[in-house]
Amino acid sequence: AINAKYIHSNLAVYCLKAYAEKNMPQDVNVQIELAEYTINQNRDEILKDIYRRQAEMICFSCYIWNLDYVESMIRDVKKVMKDVIIWAGGPEVSYDSRETLGRLPELTGVMKGEGEKTFAKLCKVYGKSSETSELSLEQIDGITFRCPDGTICERPWRVPMDLSEVPFVYHDMKKFENKIIYYETSRGCPFSCSYCLSSVDKTLRFRDTGIVKRELKFFTDS
């Protein structure tokens, strides 16, 4: 995640990690690390930290405030880590995934829309296990990806998930000290503002009220 300011945090990447870890078969060999930076950081400093981690797959979260920065970073990462698998997700790449892949030959694929279930499936593909040995990218909804022959393959959008299935991510508040906390009680929007990508998703969903009350109490008690 490359945030706009130091005080910001990226709720999306925390949700993806939490959901994937909760739903991962025991014999899938995947270790998920989060890395948050800001658009104000030195680019070489970020590139150095990414390289130091030596990840086999890197996923970037793309928004209107960081898209140019992220695209440039993707190009740089691929120069120094030629074999790394790179995926992108977020609202700024979801609705023009084919164009994004055409613009960025360094990308392996794009996750479209909400990413919890999609990211978990990708982890299972790349971390093969006895349960998922037959799973392939061609079977995963919610992605557009580059096939081995260079063609671009687009899968259908994923059916919106039950928001109550997303794990609560704020168990350790120390890592969010002096930062803004983002909490999600709903997804989708009933309005049609022309300037906002949220208007594209007409499926308005809410997190279970009982769960919301318990989680908000956690914040007030902390």
Tell me the role of every PLM-derived stretch.
Residues 19, 33-157:
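Glycine-rich beta-alpha loop elements in corrinoid/cobalamin-binding modules
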Residues 20-30:
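Signal peptide-proximal N-terminal region
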